[in-house]
Regions:
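Flexible "arm" and connector segments at domain edges
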Residues: 1-33, 37-66
């Protein structure tokens, strides 16, 4: 998956996850969630964003709120 296609891939994987949720099959939901997470990490890489660092910052914000 190339970087230029990363935004479209995120949208596609999001749609597939929504479909899996609508069907209610746990294994398919897990698979599609994994695909979406991978796509998001690839998109971050394309944007030259450190996905791990971004997640750590968000976790810290979450912990401060609760």
């Amino acid at each position: 998956m190339g970087g230029a296609q990363a935004p479209e891939q995120v949208e596609e994987e999001t749609a597939e996850l929504k479909e899996a949720i609508a069907i209610g099959q746990a294994e398919q939901i897990e698979e599609e969630m994994g695909d979406l997470l991978f796509s998001l990490i690839n998109y971050a890489r394309f944007l030259q964003v450190d996905a791990e660092q971004a997640l750590e910052k968000t976790n810290k914000k979450f912990m401060q709120r609760f």
